[in-house]
Structure formats: structure tokens, C-alpha cells
């Protein structure tokens, strides 16, 4: 039977860290990978056969692969982050939160229904307010300390259409909202294929359009659509919407449909 130990102790045993203190610092900086995924806590149990790696300083070490998704969206939409107050709904380990901080966010509210997932380096950052055991549908300006200038969302096992009222309610009228649409949670269960993957491009288009139209009902218009550069863990292709209240940059109904189909055809 494989021996199990704390990941910080195992890093020292394998010579990947000089001490448990250094191991904890590496984990807090997002530089340790457990079977390819970011280590979140020094106390995480691993076996002596678990693949452990430490990212070198020459590589940009994000706390989760999700960071690469948001980087792609912010660059595609040319959204400025510096100096803005932000909400990260569905923060999990904090990939989106880290990207926002890296791009100069003044303040990030990291909200998640789970507990103890956010990386230590982010949890201890004075610019971050952590809201755990918090359902995104229950978010309010009062709960997050006032309205924000930028909302990002990476939510699972829930339809964005049901969460949008809370998200837009937390945003200032000048804000940008960038939610990640996951078709597997928007279409009916009977339309999800083997492994939980939505293969049909038409179903994916329908799910993105449904979220965009729900946003429009709430007074938020689609300015852009972009496929995430990384698929979800099961292989689902996911899509970012860029929402604003201003109508001068809004896509027309036909323009929105064209943008969605283009994002699907150009996506991974």
C-alpha cells in the first residue's frame, strides 16, 4: 500500500523543497503541481507515488488552469482591469482572482459556494475579500461591500440564466460583466452526451444565445463573444460573453448570432 503524507512533507522528502516552510511558500505562490493540478494547501494528503512538480521561475505559475481562460478573454475583449473593484463569482482556487490582481485590480471579492479552496497566496492578499459558502444567486451589493466595476464568473452545476439577476445587481451601470457560459449546464440533461459533453454546435450556440438574451432582458447587452482557449475538464468547449449596459457598442440580434456562431467555429 502506498504511503500517504502531507504534500509539504513529501516535497521535502523528495528534495523539491529545503523545508516544510519553503514548501508552504511554494504552494502559496502557486508553484506546486499535484498530478498536474495546482496544490492549494500544505496539508493536502498525497501518496509516495503521486506526481509532484515545482514550476520554475521562468514559467508563469497561476494557481489554476482557469487563469488561462480569463487571460484569453480579457485580451480578446481588451478590457482594462487596473484600479477597478471586481467580483469573482465561483472563485474556487482563485485562477480568475489571481489574473485580476495581476492586472492591477484594486480589490477583488472572491465568492464561492465551497469552503477552503482559495489558494493561500490569494486568501492572505489584503486586496482580496473571501466569501465562502456563498451561493452566487444570493449575492447582493450589501453582501460584497458595494457595487463593483467588473464581474467575472466561472460557475458549475448551475445555469447562468438563474444567476445573472444577482450578478447584474452587484454591478455598477458602468461595469463590464464577463461570465463563462458552460453549455453542459445550460442545455437539458437529455441533451448532454456521453461523459457530460455537449458535442452539437447548435446546442452550444443555443445555450450561449439563451444566456445573452436573458442578460438583455435585465438591461445588459452583449458586446462580444469568445470561445475559452481551454476546454473544461471533461472536454466541453466554453464561451465568454462580454456584457455592458451601453447600447452604442451592443451587438444587434443578427450580429449576436453571427458572433456566437463565429466563436463556435473558431473555438477549440
Curated annotation (Swiss-Prot):
<keyword id="KW-1032">Host cell membrane</keyword>
<dbReference type="GO" id="GO:0016020">
    <property type="term" value="C:membrane"/>
</dbReference>
<keyword id="KW-0964">Secreted</keyword>
<dbReference type="GO" id="GO:0020002">
    <property type="term" value="C:host cell plasma membrane"/>
</dbReference>
<keyword id="KW-0698">rRNA processing</keyword>
<comment type="function">
    <text>Acts as a host evasion factor, that significantly contributes to the pathogenesis of M.tuberculosis by modulating adaptive immune responses by inhibiting host-protective Th1 and Th17 cytokine responses as well as autophagy. Catalyzes the 2'-O-methylation at nucleotides C1409 in 16S rRNA and C1920 in 23S rRNA. Is likely involved in ribosomal biogenesis. Also exhibits hemolytic activity in vitro, by binding with and oligomerizing into host cell membranes.</text>
</comment>
<dbReference type="Pfam" id="PF01479">
    <property type="entry name" value="S4"/>
</dbReference>
<keyword id="KW-1043">Host membrane</keyword>
<dbReference type="GO" id="GO:0031167">
    <property type="term" value="P:rRNA methylation"/>
</dbReference>
<dbReference type="GO" id="GO:0003723">
    <property type="term" value="F:RNA binding"/>
</dbReference>
<keyword id="KW-0690">Ribosome biogenesis</keyword>
<dbReference type="GO" id="GO:0090729">
    <property type="term" value="F:toxin activity"/>
</dbReference>
<dbReference type="InterPro" id="IPR004538">
    <property type="entry name" value="Hemolysin_A/TlyA"/>
</dbReference>
<dbReference type="InterPro" id="IPR029063">
    <property type="entry name" value="SAM-dependent_MTases_sf"/>
</dbReference>
<keyword id="KW-0963">Cytoplasm</keyword>
<dbReference type="InterPro" id="IPR047048">
    <property type="entry name" value="TlyA"/>
</dbReference>
<keyword id="KW-0134">Cell wall</keyword>
<dbReference type="InterPro" id="IPR036986">
    <property type="entry name" value="S4_RNA-bd_sf"/>
</dbReference>
<comment type="subunit">
    <text>Can form oligomers on macrophage phagosomal membranes.</text>
</comment>
<dbReference type="GO" id="GO:0005737">
    <property type="term" value="C:cytoplasm"/>
</dbReference>
<dbReference type="InterPro" id="IPR002877">
    <property type="entry name" value="RNA_MeTrfase_FtsJ_dom"/>
</dbReference>
<keyword id="KW-0489">Methyltransferase</keyword>
<dbReference type="InterPro" id="IPR002942">
    <property type="entry name" value="S4_RNA-bd"/>
</dbReference>
<comment type="similarity">
    <text>Belongs to the TlyA family.</text>
</comment>
<dbReference type="Pfam" id="PF01728">
    <property type="entry name" value="FtsJ"/>
</dbReference>
<keyword id="KW-0354">Hemolysis</keyword>
<keyword id="KW-0800">Toxin</keyword>
<feature type="domain" description="S4 RNA-binding">
    <location>
        <begin position="5"/>
        <end position="67"/>
    </location>
</feature>
<keyword id="KW-0472">Membrane</keyword>
<keyword id="KW-0808">Transferase</keyword>
<protein>
    <recommendedName>
        <fullName>16S/23S rRNA (cytidine-2'-O)-methyltransferase TlyA</fullName>
        <ecNumber>2.1.1.226</ecNumber>
        <ecNumber>2.1.1.227</ecNumber>
    </recommendedName>
</protein>
<dbReference type="GO" id="GO:0008649">
    <property type="term" value="F:rRNA methyltransferase activity"/>
</dbReference>
<dbReference type="GO" id="GO:0001897">
    <property type="term" value="P:symbiont-mediated cytolysis of host cell"/>
</dbReference>
<keyword id="KW-0843">Virulence</keyword>
<keyword id="KW-0204">Cytolysis</keyword>
<keyword id="KW-0694">RNA-binding</keyword>
<keyword id="KW-0949">S-adenosyl-L-methionine</keyword>
<dbReference type="GO" id="GO:0005576">
    <property type="term" value="C:extracellular region"/>
</dbReference>
Amino acid at each position: 500500500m502506498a504511503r500517504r503524507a502531507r504534500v509539504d512533507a513529501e516535497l521535502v522528502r523528495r528534495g523539491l523543497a529545503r523545508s516544510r516552510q519553503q514548501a508552504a511558500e511554494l504552494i502559496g505562490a502557486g508553484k506546486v503541481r499535484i498530478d498536474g493540478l495546482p496544490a492549494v494547501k500544505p496539508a493536502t494528503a498525497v501518496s509516495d507515488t503521486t506526481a509532484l512538480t515545482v514550476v520554475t521561475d521562468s514559467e508563469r505559475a497561476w494557481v489554476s488552469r482557469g487563469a488561462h481562460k480569463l487571460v484569453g478573454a480579457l485580451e480578446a475583449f481588451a478590457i482594462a482591469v487596473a484600479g477597478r473593484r471586481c467580483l469573482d463569482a465561483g472563485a474556487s482556487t482563485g485562477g480568475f482572482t489571481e489574473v485580476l490582481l495581476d492586472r492591477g485590480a484594486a480589490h477583488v471579492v472572491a465568492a464561492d459556494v465551497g469552503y477552503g479552496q482559495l489558494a493561500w497566496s490569494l486568501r492572505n492578499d489584503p486586496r482580496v475579500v473571501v466569501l465562502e459558502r456563498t451561493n452566487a444567486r444570493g449575492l447582493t451589493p450589501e453582501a460584497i461591500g458595494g457595487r463593483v466595476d467588473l464581474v467575472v464568473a466561472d460557475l458549475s452545476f448551475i445555469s447562468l440564466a438563474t444567476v445573472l439577476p444577482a450578478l447584474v445587481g452587484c454591478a455598477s451601470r458602468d461595469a463590464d460583466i464577463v461570465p463563462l457560459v458552460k453549455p453542459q449546464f445550460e442545455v437539458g440533461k437529455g441533451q448532454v452526451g456521453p461523459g457530460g459533453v455537449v458535442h452539437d454546435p447548435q446546442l452550444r450556440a443555443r445555450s450561449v444565445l439563451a444566456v445573452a438574451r436573458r442578460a438583455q432582458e435585465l438591461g445588459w447587452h452583449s458586446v462580444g463573444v469568445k470561445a475559452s482557449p481551454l476546454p473544461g475538464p471533461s472536454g466541453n468547449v466554453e464561451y465568454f460573453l462580454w456584457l455592458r449596459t451601453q447600447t452604442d457598442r451592443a451587438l444587434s440580434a443578427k450580429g449576436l448570432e453571427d458572433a456566437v456562431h463565429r466563436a463556435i467555429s473558431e473555438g477549440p
